[in-house]
Amino acid sequence: MKIRASVRKICEKCRLIRRRGRIMVICSNPRHKQRQG
């Protein structure tokens, strides 16, 4: 999980979702997981 100021899709499988008021990226590749800090 990377905590970043700006989250964006890295590949075409990345999905931008909103959880508990935070923008997150979920992907089949676990290295692409991100959360807005």
Swiss-Prot record:
Protein keywords: Chloroplast, Plastid, Ribonucleoprotein, Ribosomal protein
PROSITE patterns given in the database record: RIBOSOMAL_L36
Protein's UniProt name: Large ribosomal subunit protein bL36c
NCBIfam families to which the protein is assigned, alphabetical: rpmJ_bact (TIGR01022)
Subcellular location: Plastid, Chloroplast
GO biological process: translation
GO terms under cellular component: chloroplast; ribonucleoprotein complex; ribosome
Entries under InterPro entries matching the protein: Ribosomal_bL36 (IPR000473), Ribosomal_bL36_sp (IPR035977)
PANTHER family membership: 50S RIBOSOMAL PROTEIN L36, CHLOROPLASTIC, LARGE RIBOSOMAL SUBUNIT PROTEIN BL36C
Protein family: Belongs to the bacterial ribosomal protein bL36 family.
GO MF term set: structural constituent of ribosome
Coiled-coil regions listed: none
Primary residence: plastid
Keyword Iron among UniProt keywords: no
